[in-house]
């Protein structure tokens, strides 16, 4: 059965932004204009189509990325029908992981900014993630009807704070309550949307006289940006001083796809202005699946390979999200990179080494679903019936297996103990937590060996609140939650040479392992794939004083001891161990003996190497009206915060600070009462840093008591 839509007419895009930039409203309008939803869902009525979990509707934020398929032929029906797969991503920093996994499977993104508050901390995080995956993007400056909205100021912030080369393709006509429409700098006409039909129709009129000069300046800048795409465009531009509209679009598209420029659009989704122009921009400037580089992967033997976006290549897809659906059970969202998959086909999961059969395939329209018979390269769909798949796994052809690059997930920074309110719920709670952990890799569950408590860990207080809330709603488990615990770490500050010997003689065969190891601090670094290097082992044994087969176990022993720490039982990071001497016994030495000797060496050596405790430091940004600035800063100082800088923004002052996570619990309530509800804040993990001695002593005492 042939394709319904040619691959070059596909667009897989994400809509990402800061918490309140109006992302979900923008997506709602897109669904309305593309004819998918007949009544516009407003977020503040708790009715938006894309926000389908109960908590999202209550809290007015988007938590899980809903995937939706829709079609668009242009504002003037100027294109053939294009198929747009949209993923609406959350903007709250505790759910960065959802954004990360969406960007991993998208080909392009629309980043939404608020016209008045501009570039906010979360926007920086999203931007960094999009850079990491090389995602071409366009910008929509929304909420142009809000007080303090200023399109050109926001473009300036994107240049300075995000270091992006922004090229406006529109200019706003009026702002705040006088926002009327936009100037299209390519056609050099003003677009005025009609209020009467929720902006479905519009008029093309002449540019208002007072904006003519500025529009011409911006058009020149845009034309120069387009001319830089190729030598022929540049030559023509230098000779004639002008490019045709088609040439401008062609040049801009080439540079967006090369990630050299970012085009800026503006409007107000809530007031139904500007969204269709962004949809045209998606079609005109963002890539089809076969216009992005072929996806890199490796064979099962670790040889590099690639899969290009074509139905004729062997099947390969990435499972980028799991969700539990009340009617059909487990849904596995997949992005198909190559080949074709029909319902009922068997696929191979090389990460788990297992064969699975796909029961049914459904296409999601927010939380409504339509069953389909097959998916092809470029499609995003959900499979029903896969049993043993986790987020980030590859699904591929049985005969030509490849492993797509794994997704990388951050380590949680906060933990709480949970226990079911009734003993009868213990098993239900375990099942619920297991399902939630499979869905969300930044959420971990473990049992504390000493206390037997169930400990859940995540990216922030809101993240864990929502997990506990979902246990109650979706799995009917009521749980008591303990006080939040910080994910402390341990490390060493000095260098030491440690001589450790493990000898045991008790009749029969003894045990003998002797090592001399140099321990020194290691700078914790992150590689291109985002993996952290926290331990390095160097083998400098010469002349066989320790036989080869015992060297691996020494490293293993040290690593195992690192997970248990040496001061207060917290995992260690930043250790370099060099094994340079030792001895062995012909009969009594064994792998086990050397493993124990390795772990003893670290335990004894770390204390001499000035071991210390590290705590997570958060980057906190508080937006506060001028009147409460003194209180906010005084409070951050009391929380051991270091103020990094101050900025202006239309809603007041922005204070940036580095504050230990341990001091930030319950901050949301404090900052609200301090400012009578007018200040807001966001925080994300920045780094680990040493805990002051007096606090470290308390931590060690309470852990060891």
Curated annotation (Swiss-Prot):
Stored Pfam families: EFG_C (PF00679), EFG_III (PF14492), EFG_IV (PF03764), GTP_EFTU (PF00009), GTP_EFTU_D2 (PF03144)
Paired cysteines (S-S): none
Record keyword GTP-binding present: yes
Primary location recorded for the protein, binned into one broad class: cytoplasm
Compartment(s) of residence: Cytoplasm
A Gene Ontology BP annotation from the UniProt entry: ribosome disassembly
Domain tr-type G, residue spans: 8-290
Gene Ontology CC: cytoplasm
Keywords linked to the UniProt accession: Cytoplasm, Elongation factor, GTP-binding, Nucleotide-binding, Protein biosynthesis
Keyword tRNA-binding listed: no
Molecular function, one GO term: guanosine tetraphosphate binding
Residues annotated to bind GTP: 17-24, 88-92, 142-145
PROSITE patterns given in the database record: G_TR_1, G_TR_2
Coiled-coil stretches noted in the UniProt entry, renumbered to this chain: none
Function description: Catalyzes the GTP-dependent ribosomal translocation step during translation elongation. During this step, the ribosome changes from the pre-translocational (PRE) to the post-translocational (POST) state as the newly formed A-site-bound peptidyl-tRNA and P-site-bound deacylated tRNA move to the P and E sites, respectively. Catalyzes the coordinated movement of the two tRNA molecules, the mRNA and conformational changes in the ribosome.
PANTHER family xref list: RIBOSOME-RELEASING FACTOR 2, MITOCHONDRIAL, TRANSLATION ELONGATION FACTOR G-RELATED
NCBIfam families the UniProt entry points to: EF-G, PRK12740.1-5, small_GTP
Family: Belongs to the TRAFAC class translation factor GTPase superfamily. Classic translation factor GTPase family. EF-G/EF-2 subfamily.
Protein name listed in UniProt: Elongation factor G
Species annotation: Francisella philomiragia subsp. philomiragia (strain ATCC 25017 / CCUG 19701 / FSC 153 / O#319-036)
Top-level taxonomy: Bacteria, Pseudomonadati, Pseudomonadota, Gammaproteobacteria, Thiotrichales
Recorded name of the encoding gene: fusA
């Amino acid at each position: 059965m042939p394709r319904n839509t040619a691959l070059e007419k596909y667009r897989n895009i994400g809509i990402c932004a800061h918490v309140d930039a109006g992302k979900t409203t923008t997506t709602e309008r897109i669904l309305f204009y593309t004819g998918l939803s007949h009544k516009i869902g407003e977020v503040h009525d708790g009715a938006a189509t894309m926000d389908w979990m109960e908590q999202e509707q209550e809290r007015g934020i988007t938590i899980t990325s809903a995937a939706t398929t829709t079609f668009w032929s242009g504002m003037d029906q100027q294109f053939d029908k294009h198929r747009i797969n949209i993923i609406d991503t959350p903007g709250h920093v505790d759910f960065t992981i959802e954004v990360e996994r969406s960007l991993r499977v998208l080909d392009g993104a629309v980043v939404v900014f608020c016209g008045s508050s501009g570039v906010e901390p979360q926007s920086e995080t999203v931007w960094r993630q999009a850079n990491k995956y090389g995602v071409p993007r366009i910008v929509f400056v929304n909420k142009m009807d809000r007080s303090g909205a200023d399109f050109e100021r926001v473009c300036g912030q994107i240049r300075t704070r995000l270091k992006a080369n922004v090229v406006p393709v529109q200019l706003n006509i009026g702002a705040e309550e006088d926002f009327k429409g936009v100037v299209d700098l390519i056609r050099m006409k003003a677009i005025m949307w009609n209020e009467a039909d929720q902006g479905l129709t519009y008029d093309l009129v002449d540019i208002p006289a007072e904006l003519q000069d500025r529009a011409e300046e911006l058009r020149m800048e845009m034309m120069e940006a387009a001319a830089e795409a190729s030598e022929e465009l540049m030559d023509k531009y230098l000779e004639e001083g002008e490019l045709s509209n088609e040439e401008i679009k062609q040049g801009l598209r080439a540079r967006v796809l090369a990630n050299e420029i970012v085009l800026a659009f503006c409007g107000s989704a809530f007031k139904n202005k500007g969204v269709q122009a962004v949809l045209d921009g998606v079609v005109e400037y963002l890539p089809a699946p076969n216009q992005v580089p072929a996806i890199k992967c490796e064979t099962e033997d670790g040889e590099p390979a690639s899969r290009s976006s074509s139905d004729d290549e062997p099947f390969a897809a990435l499972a980028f999200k799991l969700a539990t659906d009340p009617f059909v059970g487990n849904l596995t969202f997949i992005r198909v990179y190559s080949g074709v998959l029909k319902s009922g086909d068997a696929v191979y999961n090389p990460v788990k080494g297992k064969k699975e059969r796909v029961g049914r395939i459904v296409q999601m329209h927010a939380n409504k679903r339509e069953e389909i018979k097959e998916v092809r390269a470029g499609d995003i769909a959900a499979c029903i019936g896969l049993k043993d798949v986790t987020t980030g796994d590859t699904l591929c052809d049985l005969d030509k297996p490849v492993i797509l690059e794994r997704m990388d997930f951050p380590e949680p920074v906060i933990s709480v103990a949970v226990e079911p309110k009734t003993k009868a719920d213990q098993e239900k709670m375990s099942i619920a937590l297991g399902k939630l952990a499979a869905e969300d890799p930044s959420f971990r569950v473990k049992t504390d060996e000493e206390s037997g408590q169930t400990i859940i860990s995540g990216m922030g207080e809101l993240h864990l609140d929502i997990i506990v809330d979902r246990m109650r709603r979706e799995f009917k488990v009521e749980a008591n939650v303990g006080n939040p615990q910080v994910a402390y770490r341990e490390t060493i500050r000095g260098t030491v040479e440690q001589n450790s010997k493990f000898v045991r003689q008790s009749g029969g065969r003894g045990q003998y392992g002797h090592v001399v190891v140099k321990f020194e601090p290691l700078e914790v670094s992150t590689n291109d794939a985002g993996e952290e290097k926290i331990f390095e082992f160097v083998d400098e044994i010469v002349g066989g004083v320790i036989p080869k087969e015992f060297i691996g176990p020494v490293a293993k022993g040290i690593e195992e001891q690192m997970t248990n720490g040496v001061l207060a039982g917290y995992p260690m990071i930043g250790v370099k161990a060099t094994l340079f001497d030792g001895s062995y016994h012909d009969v009594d030495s064994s792998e086990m003996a050397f493993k124990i000797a390795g772990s003893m060496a670290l335990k004894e050596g770390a204390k001499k190497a000035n071991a210390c405790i590290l705590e997570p430091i958060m980057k906190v940004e508080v937006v506060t009206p001028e009147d409460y600035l003194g209180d906010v800063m005084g409070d951050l100082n009391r929380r051991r915060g270091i103020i990094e800088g101050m900025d202006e923004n239309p809603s007041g002052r922005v204070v940036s600070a580095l504050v230990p996570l341990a001091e930030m619990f319950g901050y949301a309530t404090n900052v609200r009462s301090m400012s009578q509800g007018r200040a807001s804040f966001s925080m994300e993990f920045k780094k680990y840093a040493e805990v002051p001695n007096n606090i470290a002593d308390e931590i060690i005492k309470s852990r060891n008591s």
